Amino acid sequence: RKTDANLVQQDSLDTETYISSFQTSGYHRTYSESADKAVQQQLSFGGNISYRFKKLQVGFNAIQYRFSLPVIKGADPYNRYAFTGKKLNNISIDYSFTYRNLHLFGEFAGNGLHGKALINGMLLSVSALADMSLLYRYISRDYQSLNANAFTESATPKNESGLFAGISIRPVTNWQIDAYADIFHFPWLKYLVDAPSRGSDYLLQVTYKPNRQLEIYSRYKRETKISNDADDFQMISPVIASKRKNWRTQVNFKLSKHLTYRNRIELSWFTQGAGGPSRGFLVNVDLLYKPMLQP
């Protein structure tokens, strides 16, 4: 199949043509987006073998990608471990195991002799009133995968390790409390982050739903990340911490089968480095209409 990609040719005397990046947005609105349309030919083939024994399931997966044009990333330091070439192999072994109210799952993946990725998780129903989840992930800085859909903070699964823990409690009828904590680390540089970094993400939400028509929830979220200092113009910028806090309260009320009223109030605080916090708020009212489908 043909895929969208950024085509690069050095000059009119240089016949070498290569791909600097893949385009996954699917848009062809501008000249540059249209120029990226279907320039790379990709051949993908692979397979899966699964084995189930009582409550245990194990699977072996393999896939290979071949490209008509080589992929060559830019010389930026964060691209040091990026995929280059015309062929990429991915193999993995996954498992899942269920015992009563406990479910364990995970996968170990690799590409070639270097890049490795590991994920292990647990889902536990403590009682009829509480559920817990725990997930650990490790993706090496040189792991590459084109179509992975992993539980990661980054948009692409690479150069990350982290631990996620969540809990959902239903203390009384019509009330639910959800909370999670996610702590992550990036051992190598990232785009706009010129140093190894770490961060965290916390959330607490309380929901009240007395019936099918009414739902009210209040949510507090706090996130800390590292980014380059935007005011520093050195080749390798120093990094600073960015902290974002958000508090949202929302009311959803179903007026009828086709009409829903929604009201939201949201407050935000953003702090970067040693500077003072920036504040903002949002108030909006929506009236959602879902038309009746005609036969």
Q: Residue spans of the language-model regions?
A:
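Exposed, low-structure sequence patches enriched in small/polar residues
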Residues: 35-75, 80-295
